[in-house]
């Protein structure tokens, strides 16, 4: 993936403003609520019976935080995103058997919570860079499936 200086600046700027402990749980909870079939991978997380249970679930919150920290690894290594996510790609495909389409669903939920957080600062240019970054992450997480 080729990154312009502007895209690098935008992506780093976005992530520097994010509170992972707040937005991670919101994004992951949203994914489990909006796309309930994604819950099948998280049966060990306990009560996922309804939106309130999901949003109050400590395991869901912890995983959401973990996801954003995982994205942060990509931000810090934008020139080697494939390398950053190679091990996670193998884990999700070979051991966990996660449907790779779910990565896109979660990335959409992350975009929504980031857009809500940034408000008017989430301009079309900002969104384009953010979507390009998330698209690269999704692509490389799904690499083992091909």
Curated annotation (Swiss-Prot):
One of its GO terms (molecular function) is heme binding. Residues 2-146 form the Globin domain. Belongs to the globin family. The keyword Transport applies. Coiled coil: none annotated. Keywords: Heme, Iron, Metal-binding, Oxygen transport, Transport. GO terms for cellular component: blood microparticle; haptoglobin-hemoglobin complex; hemoglobin complex. InterPro entries: Globin, Globin-like_sf, Globin/Proto, Hemoglobin_b, Hemoglobin_oxygen_transport. The keyword Iron applies. The lineage of its organism: Eukaryota, Metazoa, Chordata, Craniata, Vertebrata. This is Hemoglobin subunit beta. Gene3D superfamilies: Globins. SUPFAM superfamilies: Globin-like (SSF46458). Heterotetramer of two alpha chains and two beta chains. Involved in oxygen transport from the lung to the various peripheral tissues. GO terms for biological process: hydrogen peroxide catabolic process. Red blood cells. Heme b binds at residues 63, 92.
């Amino acid at each position: 993936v080729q990154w312009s200086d502007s895209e690098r600046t935008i992506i780093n700027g976005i992530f520097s403003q994010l509170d992972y402990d707040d937005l991670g749980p919101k994004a992951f909870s949203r994914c489990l609520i909006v796309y309930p079939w994604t819950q099948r991978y998280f049966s060990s997380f306990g009560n996922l019976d309804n939106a309130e249970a999901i949003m109050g679930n400590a395991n869901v919150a912890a995983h959401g935080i973990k996801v954003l920290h995982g994205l942060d690894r990509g931000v810090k290594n934008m020139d080697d995103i494939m390398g950053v996510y190679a091990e996670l790609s193998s884990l999700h495909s070979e051991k966990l058997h996660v449907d790779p389409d779910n990565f896109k669903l979660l990335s959409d939920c992350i975009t929504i919570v980031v857009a809500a957080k940034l408000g008017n600062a989430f301009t079309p240019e900002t969104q384009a860079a953010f979507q390009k970054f998330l698209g690269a992450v999704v692509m490389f997480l799904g690499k083992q499936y091909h």
